[in-house]
Design a protein with these regions (language model features):
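Extended, well-ordered protein cores
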Residues: 2-162, 178-184, 191, 219, ...
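Extended charged low-complexity segments that act as oligomerization/scaffolding linkers
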Residues: 183, 187, 193-196, 201-209
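Covalent nucleotidyltransferase core used to form phosphodiester bonds in nucleic acids
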Residues: 162-173
């Protein structure tokens, strides 16, 4: 990762024909971290320096596209409005340039002379971060930054914070004095961070700077700055600026969207046709397609007109503007993707007659699934091969990425691009589906509905509190079906982590829950190998799965935090859980789709006072 050159150096990044300048390397991160942790717009600390990761604008050539391989996932690309995705540049060993970064924050302090000012006023050498008045003492980037819920980012206004009571000369930062920052050492609180100025104003501490209205009370408004985008003009912004710690997770949260590669897009043919797809779409007859393929794929028999016709038909079927999809009402395009995956997981895709390039193999177990009937579990499916693409759509600041609307998502580029950063993982898993008639009968119980309604109310309140406009807050997805399946997936992952040798962090859940779906996929997937070697798939055999379910449900009947856990009216963040804690139902957050909320193990096993709320009560009493 490399910062921009000094101001006086001649930079030709804006010229698409000009080569990228060779700049000093500042560090390296894993490819997956460029999507989940250090993506576009995030702050990254390298040694004693701090940078913001540049955007993906093609005109500014911030990303080395020749080092960012193209990956295809047609269904997800169509929903996100791009043509394809790109892997982030490779690691330090193989990358020549990588991703560029820009220095941020720009305000620094010197630990020796305690001077606090913009970095240019220290007059450091090119690409250095030192105080020239203190024998090249390394400078310390500001611990505090300012952000708003629309994603804007700026330096903390130290001048206005210090001169709050002397606005005549200090509001514009022209008092003529020299500011300094020191630490009293009395405590680790903000009260020990002291700001002073040689102009004589009373010194102040940073205490109170994190209050929601601390900056607006001083007349500070968001300037709409986007330092991760080169040349981005300041936007008009109505959001209130907030003070944040530079290393806080609230400074940057990714908005990730993912999809599984399923037939007919999973056999590698779509990748071969990517450059020709727009042309193939324009043809209206099979004969035109055959003539074009003979010229474009001379000598390649794997690309047939029948296969192309099948892909074109599938694309029309998946079109969100189709009448069948329009009738779905408020169903989001991402939920449509889940429904397509659910249908394919239920129907399967056998290994026979499939080539080595097939990325989705899903088959039923050979043994009799009758042993699972007491659990209300339909025939499981063994996903022996899968590929998932996870794309970075945008990012948010301050607001939770799941509770904020798209209007608060910060863009990755100044101008629209035809690609997005993404990573692909491959692995295997087990798909479990519950009998919907059993679920519907169980969900009609007033006791079950009351427990879930309390979760839903608390979750709705939390989403409204986090949203800038409560009217725009998303609606909680909590339903008896979702909470049950979500909790069951958690206890099953915990069981496999104890019995099958997989750490819980190596397994992930993928939920399929609405009025038309009732299942979940538990899978393991990695970006640097072809997944595991059948260890997860083996857990899906009916005999093993029945043993694991029985053991997991037995464990769920008792928690080391009981009776407090099972009797809790609410628990978790915002009261969005009931009987669930880290000792019984919670997972590492990388394994959970809902950040460990909307969980209630009482819906699995019941409570001592009312066993009837448990979906699996009959199995446990048998």
């Amino acid at each position: 990762m490399t910062p921009p050159p000094a101001r006086r150096s001649r930079r030709t990044d804006g010229d698409s024909a000009a080569p990228r300048l060779a700049l000093p390397r500042r560090g390296s991160v894993r490819r997956s971290q460029m999507i989940t942790t250090y993506g576009v717009g995030s702050l990254i600390a390298v040694d004693n320096e701090s940078f913001v990761v540049s955007g993906i604008d093609d005109a500014h050539r911030s990303w080395a596209l020749d080092e960012a391989p193209i990956i295809h996932e047609h269904r997800l690309a169509r929903v996100l409005g791009v043509k394809h995705f790109r892997l982030p540049p490779a690691s330090e060993d193989t990358s020549k340039d990588g991703v560029r970064v820009r220095r941020f924050p720009l305000w620094h302090s010197c630990p020796s002379c305690q001077c606090l000012q913009h970095i240019r006023d220290f007059n450091p050498p090119t690409n250095k971060n030192v105080c020239t008045d203190c024998d090249d003492e390394p400078l310390v980037p500001s611990r505090f930054v300012v952000a708003c819920e629309d994603g804007h980012l700026d330096d903390f206004p130290y001048w206005k914070w210090l001169h709050r009571k002397n606005r005549e000369d200090g509001a514009t930062g022209r008092c003529g004095g020299q500011m300094s920052m020191r630490f009293s050492g009395r405590s680790a609180s903000l009260r020990s961070v002291i700001i002073s100025c040689t102009c004589g104003v009373p010194e102040v501490s940073m205490e109170g700077s994190f209050r929601r209205s601390a900056l607006t009370d001083l007349g500070v408004r968001c300037e709409g700055r986007r330092p991760w985008l080169k040349g981005a003009p300041a936007e008009f912004c109505r959001q209130a600026p907030r003070t944040l710690q530079r290393g806080s997770s609230s400074v940057w949260q990714p908005v990730l969207k993912s999809a599984l590669s399923i037939p007919p897009w999973s056999d590698g043919l779509a990748a071969k046709l990517s450059e020709h797809w727009e042309t193939l779409r324009s043809f209206s007859s099979r004969m035109e397609i055959e003539i074009y393929l003979k010229g474009a794929f001379r000598g390649d028999d794997s690309v047939t007109a029948d296969a192309v016709m099948e892909l074109l038909a599938a694309e029309q079927e998946e079109d969100p503007d189709r009448e069948s999809n329009a009738d779905a009402g408020a169903v989001s395009p991402y939920q449509v993707l889940r429904r397509q995956e659910y249908e394919r997981l239920c129907s399967g895709n056998a290994l026979r007659d499939k080539g080595r390039e097939e990325q989705f193999i899903c088959e039923p177990p050979v043994s009799n699934p009758a042993v699972l009937e007491p659990f209300g579990v339909a025939r499981p499916m063994l996903v022996k091969r899968l590929r998932e693409v996870r794309a970075l759509k945008a990012f948010t600041r301050i607001a939770d990425a799941e509770s904020s609307s798209e209007s608060h998502e910060a863009a990755l580029s100044l101008t629209p691009t035809d690609w997005l950063p993404a990573m692909e993982v491959s692995g295997e898993g087990v798909f479990v589906r519950l009998d919907e008639s059993w679920l519907d009968e169980w969900a009609e119980s007033p006791a079950v509905a009351a427990r879930v309604e309390q979760l839903r109310t608390n979750h709705d309140r939390m989403l409204q509190e986090r949203a800038t406009d409560p009217a725009e807050a998303p609606v909680s997805p909590a339903t008896p079906r979702l909470v049950l399946l979500h909790t069951l997936a958690h206890v099953l992952i915990n069981e496999w982590s104890l019995d099958a040798g997989y750490p819980a962090a190596a397994l992930r859940e993928r939920l399929y829950t609405d009025d038309t779906m009732a299942g979940f996929l538990i899978y393991t997937a990695t970006s640097d190998s072809a997944g595991s070697l059948g260890g997860v798939v083996a857990q899906g055999e009916p005999d093993r799965l029945a043993e694991a379910l029985h053991s997991a449900l037995r464990r769920a009947t008792w928690c080391s935090a009981d009776p407090l856990c099972i009797e809790a009216g609410t628990s978790g963040i915002g009261g969005a859980n009931r009987a669930a804690c880290h000792a019984c139902a919670m997972l590492p957050e990388t394994s959970c789709e809902y950040n460990n909320i909307l969980l209630d193990r009482a819906l699995l096993v019941g409570t001592p006072e009312d066993p009837s709320v448990g979906f699996f009560r009959q199995v446990l009493t048998a």
